[in-house]
Amino acid sequence: MRDGIFIVDGDGHVMDFSHRCYQKYLPEQYRHRIAFFPGAYWDRRQAPNGDMGRDPDTPEEMLADLGQEGIDLAFLYPTSALRIGEIREPEYQAALCRAYNDFMADWCKAAPDRLKGVAIVPYLDPTEAARELDRAVSRLGLVGLMFPTFIPGRNVAEPFLLADL
């Protein structure tokens, strides 16, 4: 809190690269494919006039950064998994979403009052997406949903996205 103002980061990001997330949480049958987003890992530490800084490797490092900036609460979104809409295989997409959501829930356990994770769901199977959202919120404690705004070859207003529950 700064000057009596509660500060919220409404667009925080966790670096969900393979060594932090998918090697541990993805089922064995998919681990050989963990470089699943082409070009998703980029060198973000270099800027034209110097270094940009370092991404936090742990929740504790993130909390230290938040403290330094005076941020009281952060809603956390994926980084690599922002590209979940590019995955075309329903089962693989569902496995990636479950792995990411498990990772995010564990990350937020370090300070559940300050770190609020946002889930991703496998939109290729709307019924599975509804199940995963329910699991992410009711069992894992995640607080929202990030849905891709671009689905290759589809319109996000199409009826195929309606779950059959």
Which positions does each model-derived feature cover?
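Helix-coil boundary/capping segments in enzymes
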Residues: 1-165
